[in-house]
Amino acid sequence: MRRGLIMLAPALVAGISFASTRYARAEDVKLPATLTFTAYDTGTAGFNIAVGVGKMMKDKYGTDVRVLPAGNDVARLAPLRAKRAASAAMGSGTYFAQEGVFEFGSKEWGPQPLQILLSTVDCNCGSLGVAADAGVKDLKDLKGKRVGFVVGSPALNQNSLAVLAFAGLTQKDVKVVEFASYGAMWKGLINNDTDAAFGTTITGPAKEAETSPRGLIWPPLPAKDKDGWARMQKVGSFFFPQAATCGAGITPDKPIELGNYPYPIFVAYASQPADQVYAITKAMIVNYDAYKDSAPGAGGLAADRQTKNLVVPVHPGAVKALKEAGQWSDAQDAHNNKLIKRQEVLGAAWAEYGKSNPPSDDKAFLDGWMKARAAALAKADMPNGFED
């Protein structure tokens, strides 16, 4: 591990708050002496990018950044919610957490008002990687095959279902194999416990799988297949077509048409101080050159490469930093305000549902919440997004 970057077990992180009274200064950025980020498992793209950003903060500001790996979305957000981390490097789970669906529809969670600092879209994509010895050429060939799911990670599982939907397949058409974490799922592919796993093309585990005896392929998602993309976006609205030019088994001269969305997405809670979020975001923007080559995918964090008008709002502190970089518009501001209003509607609906004496049974509780959620969004004339 590079100097200044410490990977901690959850038990050790429990005693560390991102709030600090001792600050390190450089230019007009003020960072605490210690910061904690959460990310996907060790070796993943999200983890490696967080490490690269952390090294920059150590080199430029003397800030020690601790990157805490976590195997699912719930584990990534728990330290952030408890104010023991400053940011989480998330994926599409950001959206599911905001919406209060899947695991985030449980009594312990509900809608989470997450807001974005910066996100990255680079030369990589995200899709189902398939063992080369599984007899799969196209996605439709996954029918009857084993597909890895991660317990407690609705994002990864929904992403897998979205890719399957491209080929007209559903969960019933494959054999779901559950794993405890993202890393365990990819180990399962290497060890012949599953045939397919969702991930980014640049994730470390995918590269391990490619060099393993099983090998790895990425079945294509051609952009010209409009029906396939319509099916896929119905399940994962945040996906868009993109040609991957980097990753396991992929080069610029051998691109593969796949799908993508911003990953990682560095998020904070709406309640986190704007000046703190501003400082972190500003540091990432002005020192971009110091970490852009630190890990595959890090280059996409540039201020002028930010995906505009995502389904989750940008934090006011990050908005300030983006405005100063000349990368924010009135149209984005209007869109952002609508998303913040959506989070307020969802939060109010959750509070009201909690007062309605909801069922104690977990499934009945979730079913009741989804109905209350749908009613609140309809009343506010906002799209549901999870009708099916």
Language model features with spans:
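Immediate post-signal peptide segment of exported/extracytoplasmic ligand-binding proteins
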Residues: T21-F37, G135-R146, S329-Q332, P383-E387
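Ligand-binding clefts/hinges and TM-proximal coupling segments of bilobed small-molecule sensing domains
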Residues: K145-A162, F238-L301, L310
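An extracytoplasmic/periplasmic, membrane-proximal ligand-sensing/linker region
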Residues: P32, T201-R214, W218, D275-V277, ...
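Bacterial N-terminal signal peptides
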Residues: M7-S17
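Pocket-lining segment of extracytoplasmic ligand-binding domains
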Residues: S92-T94, E103-F104, N124, A134, ...
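N-terminal export leaders
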Residues: M1-M7
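Pocket-flanking alpha-helical
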Residues: I49-M56, R66-E108, V136, G183-G188, ...
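Bilobed "Venus flytrap"/periplasmic-binding protein-like clamshell domains
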Residues: P32-K60, V65-R66, N124-N191, I202, ...
